[in-house]
Curated annotation (Swiss-Prot):
Protein's name in the database: Spike glycoprotein
Effect of S109G: In strain: Isolate BE03-40001 and Isolate NL
Source organism (scientific name): Human coronavirus NL63 (HCoV-NL63)
Signal sequence segment: 1-18
Keywords, comma-separated and alphabetical: Coiled coil, Disulfide bond, Glycoprotein, Host membrane, Host-virus interaction, Membrane, Signal, Transmembrane, Transmembrane helix, Viral attachment to host cell, Viral envelope protein, Virion, Virulence, Virus entry into host cell
């Protein structure tokens, strides 16, 4: 990536020595987060210029300006001509430092040319009219994007909507003195890496290909492909229903791009964009192809802090009739609030579409916006998707106006113009992880097998046929009687209601309510009539037929569909299926207004045809020499029809034994036509992710291969040169080389002679050995599997279970076979293995003998004793100040003063001979020394001595601070030296740690390889189960693979027929799975017996069989458990050197006496005329002795000639394998193989010898590394830092006297009030008693009235 560093000291290049060098970009306002490194894309400065006195005019979309001195300058963005209705942008500053700056976006009243900028002052109708103080060296910028003007002011970034701002493409610059300003002309979008700190820009780097955009912006490849490695952060698969969560799937998605248009956050687009990537200011990034696309994908990219980043914006769709507005609001009332969140939103947003037809305004609710909107997709056919899910359908769309801006400079979006293409996608958590285009032959092969990488081997390729094939129809000449049926829907509207359903819909069949076909052929068509009532909403409604419950679609009825009987009706008839008639308003609201009901029966007497025919005719449509889908005399299929020169008198159709159509005769002309398969599946050879060869049935070049070779049974095409000798893969008796060349594979000649010569033979005897550890894995068990047959087949459907009962004991047989095999498996494993309970006891990690692990184990929290200090009440009554002291100065000072402020100076301490006082003084001490200072100033020289205590105390406290700083500096030097030493040791240590980790990683990699081999065995059963589960997706020629869906769509009889197909297919799949499981049990049982033999012979004893316990001479073996099996580690001897000798089977003396070796493992050989014997195991020659030989009768060797029939009389247990297999094959019953591909179970034999060797080498390397690390650790431990400690001193400062006075006054007042309340209430009674006594003794004119008892008087 090419980077340009824009230096912070401006200007650059030729301006550096003439412009003010203090100008920089630290104050540039971009709206980016503080204290962060951010990628910003937009109209930003790159190259800077120094202006002179003349007026300069540039083509620009904006500018940035830096005032560098006490001079005047002016800038204007204009159109180059005067327009009274046009807004212009004008910036000027006054002479002088910190002068005023004028910024205007206004219209001007007179014909100003903007060439001189001298009379551009009379303005009106201003959008922006600012007057502010300039900041020397701070940049000021103005950029234009569409109709949005962005101002980069000194302390803020703001945007304004300016009509026709895109016309302001001329920049006039006037600097009234030389070198009075530095400016940058902006005319292109750039990407900048900006680093901010404390509100300032500390790094400003411009890049052409910034890494920050690689996650969201890419360069489209020439064929419109998205490059490999693109992370698809904000791309989703489009769906009209369920969303794929995880897995690999082949889909048809809009992922072929013709243009990728990045729209930064500092720009906006306000015009319509068309589906051919034209309109507005579309700027494609990289590849561009001028064509009409299917969709436009708007991918929103925002930062994590963009929560509730709301901007006013709308999405406008231009349809054939009118414009439709899409907007969202956080109010469910549907109030027009054109807000679209750019980033995560913290509250729900309700979305509506709005349209205005004539003068009527209509809003329709379409859904709730997701919490985080990452992608918006608009299809040309009217579909609207958010995050991959379809929200509504508008019909055909001509253009889109995505008028959305963001408040954050770091946010942006991209517009991808895409078409639908066949792709293979890997999805994880609904996110696209990988993408493969199914274009080239090899890519199609990958897509056929749903794999992103194919292993080397041969694959069947049958993807050459076109998806859409022409149709061939051939029938016998018959007398045609035709019936035309018109299904008519007439809709009438009334009033001015747009979203209400039609006022009335009349449906009829040829003017009646029902029609039954009585002729041999019929054609039916749907007619929609709209009665014009003057309502403006008529054209917005559409009425069409939907796919209903019939097993055929309405559009296919005329495609030569055959029936025995068929009737149509507009009213429901018992036993009929239906096609609903649906009305939709602008494809947003849907209403069922009727239905077409069909009753039919299977047969061939009535045929639907696309157009009317009558009379005796041969209705045929024959496609020759091309792959076609045919219906020939009721034989249906696909194939290539060719004319033949044969002449056959009998018959009109010719089929094979399997029922396939081979040829037919035209009954009118007598011509014979042959039918061959379209493209028989080819066998392609894949090597290193490419097709290197192909075996085909036709003589033509394919797959980009040119060299064609004709063989007896097939054609072979490749690009090989036919000059190789080594095959990388074999097919039958042919070998395929790396370049695709085809070579014959001949039987390999064995170097071993199976039969020893009677007289002599050349033998190789080992003379040197090496020890080897060989690994062998044997599977001894597999996980038992039990399948609930009824649940698997019927998935709980009760009607399906009733049908399943008719299959008698099918499920019972399957379940019993699995259950019995699992039971036998468990018994065999239990009888074979015994477990030692002591081996599974968990050791206590704290008691490992002499090893103390307490330093590495978690410790319990032990609460330390409380440090002596003041009480809680004292902490409440005093303000505590914590300082760092010198040695014992603070403690000694505190004990000397005993809390008295008057003793402050008298208790001064000395540290290294210098008088010091603690740095903290309370209010009392400050008042005391303030009084001393004021007293020394009252009478000048007479009282100057009174200020001595103040000066001494001040100097002593300054000494305290100075000494404290000195100690800190000394500690800093000690720490720096020790830290540097420690860093050197740590760096060296971690370098060794890095090497050790590297070795460990490589060792773990070898272990991973070994474990993967074991994992393959473990996962075989899971693969089989996965294959069994995948069979549930097959419909087995039923109309659906869902039983419930079948019963929902069809009547009971038809549904039972369809479900019966599912039951048959699923039972067949289940039987195949059970066969696999039983075969696997048999294999595991044999492997278990072999493992038991190896335990007895290899582990418990030493084997004499060469190659049984490892590939060598066995020494000893160790067995360990492994997943589902045992892992044997065989230690064997392997020969490294051999001695070749000419061995003798014996010696013959004078032709009469024969002597042969007594021991079978001895060899007699001759060495330069001297006979010696040696062991076959190890070459140890010695002279023979008499005890080594045994005498035989003579030297003759006699053979007995017998026939194969008589051989069993000599060898009773001899078995002729070939004859046995031949008889077995002849006695096999004839059966038809099920049409299922069975996933093979491969018994895996592991070879971990190379991995173990690597592990041993890595272990030795790790041990050496640990020794080096120990030395480095010792050096690190020696790095001891001895610091001078600053004591932590706590000092309590008393509150001032007036605080205590206030507390005392408050306390006295509260106490008085409390006593008064107690004495004044009845609870105490003191006051009441005293007042009563006094009133009794002397009544001093009390005003209290005496108490009189009232008497009730009745008045007559």
């Amino acid at each position: 990536m090419k980077l340009f560093l824009i230096l912070l000291v401006l200007p650059l290049a030729s301006c550096f020595f003439t412009c003010n060098s203090n100008a920089n970009l630290s104050m540039l306002q971009l709206g980016v987060p503080d204290n962060s490194s951010t990628i910003v894309t937009g109209l930003l400065p790159t190259h800077w210029f120094c202006a002179n006195q003349s007026t300069s005019v540039y083509s620009a979309n904006g500018f940035f300006y830096i005032d560098v001195g006490n001079h005047r300058s002016a800038f204007a963005l204009h159109t180059g001509y005067y327009d009274a209705n046009q807004y212009y942008i004008y910036v000027t500053n006054e002479i002088g430092l910190n002068a005023s700056v004028t910024l205007k976006i206004c219209k001007f009243s007179r014909n100003t040319t903007f060439d001189f900028l001298s009379n551009a002052s009379s303005s009106f109708d201003c959008i922006v009219n600012l007057l502010f103080t300039e900041q020397l060296g701070a940049p000021l910028g103005i950029t234009i994007s569409g109709e949005t003007v962005r101002l980069h002011l000194y302390n803020v970034t703001r945007t304004f909507y300016v009509p026709a701002a895109y016309k302001l493409t001329k920049l006039s610059v006037k600097c009234y003195f030389n070198y009075s300003c530095v400016f940058s002309v902006v005319n292109a979008t750039v990407t900048v890496n900006v680093t901010t700190h404390n509100g300032r820009v500390v790094n400003y780097t411009v890049c052409d290909d910034c890494n920050g955009y690689t996650d969201n912006i890419f360069s489209v490849q020439q064929d419109g492909r998205i490059p490999n490695g693109f992370p698809f952060n904000n791309w989703f698969l489009l769906t009209n229903g369920s969303t794929l969560v995880d897995g690999v799937s082949r889909l048809y998605q809009p992922l072929r791009l013709t243009c990728l248009w990045p729209v930064p956050g500092l720009k906006s687009s306000t015009g319509f964009v068309y589906f051919n990537a034209t309109g507005s200011d579309v700027n494609c990034n990289g590849y561009q192809h001028n064509s009409v696309v299917d969709v436009m994908r708007y991918n929103l990219n925002f930062s994590a802090n963009s929560l509730d980043n709301l901007k006013s914006g709308v999405i406008v769709f231009k349809t054939l009739q009118y414009d439709v507005l899409f907007y969202c609001s956080n109010s469910s009332s549907g109030v027009l609030d054109t807000t679209i969140p750019f980033g995560p939103s913290s509250q729900p947003y309700y979305c509506f579409i709005n349209s205005t037809i004539n003068t009527t305004h209509v809003s329709t609710f379409v859904g709730i916006l997701p919490p985080t909107v990452r992608e918006i997709v608009v299809a040309r056919t009217g579909q609207f998707y958010i995050n991959g899910f379809k929200y509504f359908d508008l019909g055909f769309i001509e253009a889109v106006n995505f008028n959305v801006t963001t408040a954050s400079a770091t946010d942006f979006w991209t517009v991808a113009f895409a078409t639908f293409v066949d792709v293979l996608v890997n999805v994880s958590a609904t996110n696209i992880q990988n993408l493969l285009y199914c274009d080239s032959p090899f890519e199609k092969l990958q897509c056929e097998h749903l794999q992103f990488g194919l292993q080397d081997g041969f694959y069947s390729a049958n993807f050459l046929d076109d998806n859409v094939l022409p149709e061939t129809y051939v029938a016998l000449p018959i007398y045609y009687q035709h019936t035309d049926i018109n299904f008519t829907a007439t809709a009438s509207f009334g009033g001015s209601c747009y979203v209400c359903k039609p006022h009335q819909v009349n449906i009829s069949l040829n003017g009646n309510t029902s029609v039954c076909v009585r002729t041999s052929h019929f054609s039916i068509r749907y007619i929609y009539n709209r009665v014009k009532s003057g309502s403006p909403g008529d054209s917005s409604w559409h009425i069409y037929l939907k796919s209903g419950t019939c097993p055929f679609s309405f559009s296919k009825l005329n495609n030569f569909q055959k029936f025995k009987t068929i009737c149509f009706s507009t009213v429901e008839v018992p036993g009929s299926c239906n096609f609903p008639l649906e009305a939709t308003w602008h494809y947003t609201s849907y209403t069922i207004v009727g239905a077409l009901y069909v009753t039919w029966s299977e047969g061939n007497s009535i045929t639907g045809v696309p157009y009317p025919v009558s009379g005796i005719r041969e209705f045929s449509n024959l496609v020759l020499n091309n792959c076609t889908k045919y219906n020939i005399y009721d034989y249906v299929g696909t194939g290539i029809i060719r004319s033949s020169n044969q002449s056959l008198a009998g018959g009109i159709t010719y089929v094979s034994n399997s029922g396939n159509l081979l040829g037919f005769k035209n009954v009118s002309t007598g011509n014979i036509f042959i039918v061959t398969p379209c493209n028989q599946p080819d066998q392609v050879a894949v090597y290193q992710q490419s097709i290197i060869g192909a075996m085909t049935a036709v003589n033509e070049s394919r797959y980009g291969l040119q060299n064609l070779l004709q063989l007896p049974n097939f054609y072979y095409v490749s690009n090989g040169g036919n000059n190789c000798t080594t095959a990388v893969m074999t097919y039958s008796n042919f070998g395929i080389c790396a370049d695709g060349s085809l070579i014959p594979v001949r039987p390999r000649n064995s170097s071993d002679n199976g039969i020893s010569a009677i007289i002599t033979a050349n033998l190789s005897i080992p003379s040197n050995w090496t020890t080897s550890v060989q690994v062998e894995y044997l599977q001894i068990t597999s996980t038992p599997i039990v399948v609930d047959c009824a649940t698997y087949v019927c998935n709980g459907n009760p009607r399906c279970k009733n049908l399943l009962k008719q299959y008698t004991s099918a499920c019972k047989t399957i379940e019993d076979a699995l259950r019995l095999s699992a039971h036998l498996e468990t018994n065999d494993v239990s009888s074979m293995l015994t477990f030692d309970s002591n081996a599974f006891s968990l050791a206590n990690v704290t008691s490992f003998g002499d090893y103390n692990l307490s330093s590495v184990l978690p410790q319990r929290n032990i609460r330390s004793s409380r440090i002596a200090g003041r009480s809680a009440l004292e902490d409440l009554l005093f303000s505590k100040v914590v300082t760092s002291g010198l040695g014992t100065v603070d403690v000694d000072y505190k004990s000397c003063t005993k809390g008295l402020s008057i003793a402050d100076l008298a208790c001064a301490q000395y540290y290294n001979g210098i008088m010091v006082l603690p740095g903290v003084a309370d209010a009392e001490r400050m008042a005391m020394y303030t009084g001393s200072l004021i007293g020394g100033m009252v009478l000048g020289g007479l009282t100057s001595a009174a200020a001595i205590p103040f000066s001494l105390a001040l100097q002593a406290r300054l000494n305290y601070v100075a000494l404290q700083t000195d100690v800190l500096q000394e500690n800093q030097k000690i720490l720096a030296a020790s830290f540097n030493k420690a860093i050197n040791n740590i760096v060296a240590s971690f370098s060794s740690v890095n090497d050790a980790i590297t070795q460990t990683a490589e060792a773990i990699h070898t272990v991973t390889i070994a474990l993967n081999k074991i994992q393959d065995v473990v996962n075989q059963q899971g693969s089989a189960l996965n294959h069994l589960t995948s069979q549930l997706r097959h419909n087995f020629q039923a109309i659906s693979n869902s039983i419930q869906a079948i019963y929902d769509r069809l009547d009971s009889i038809q549904a039972d027929q369809q479900v019966d197909r599912l039951i048959t297919g699923r039972l067949a799949a289940l039987n195949a799975f059970v066969s696999q499981v039983l075969n696997k049990y048999t294999e595991v049982r044999g492997s278990r017996r072999l493992a038991q033999q190896k335990i007895n012979e290899c582990v418990k004893s030493q084997s004499n069989r060469y190659g049984f316990c490892g590939n060598g001479t066995h020494i000893f073996s160790i067995v360990n458990s492994a997943p589902d099996g045992l892992l044997f580690l065989h230690t064997v001897l392997l020969p490294t050197d051999y001695k070749n000798v000419k061995a003798w089977s014996g010696i013959c003396v004078d032709g009469i006496y024969g002597y042969v070796l007594r021991q079978p493992n001895l060899v007699l050989y001759s060495d330069n005329g001297v006979f010696r014997v040696t062991s076959r195991v190890m070459f140890q020659p010695r002279l023979p002795v008499l005890s080594d030989f045994v005498q035989i009768y003579n030297c003759n060797v006699t053979f007995v000639n017998i026939s194969r029939v008589e051989l069993h009389t000599v060898i009773p247990d001899y078995v002729d394998v070939n004859k046995t297999l031949q008889e077995f094959a002849q006695n096999l019953p004839k059966y038809v193989k099920p049409n299922f591909d069975l996933t093979p179970f491969n018994l895996t034999y592991l070879n971990l010898s190379s991995e173990l060797k690597q592990l041993e080498a890595k272990t030795a390397s790790l041990f050496q590394t640990t020794v080096e690390l120990q030395g480095l650790i010792d050096q690190i431990n020696s790095t001891y830092v001895d610091l001078k400690l600053l004591n932590r001193f706590e000092n309590y400062i008393k509150w001032p006297w007036w605080v205590w006075l206030i507390i005392s006054v408050v306390f006295v007042v509260l106490l008085s009030l409390l006593v008064f309340c107690c004495l004044s209430t009845g609870c105490c009674g003191c006051c009441n008693c005293l007042t009563s006594s006094m009133r009794g003794c002397c009544d001093c004119g009390s005003t209290k009235l005496p108490y009189y008892e009232f008497e009730k008087v009745h008045v007559q």
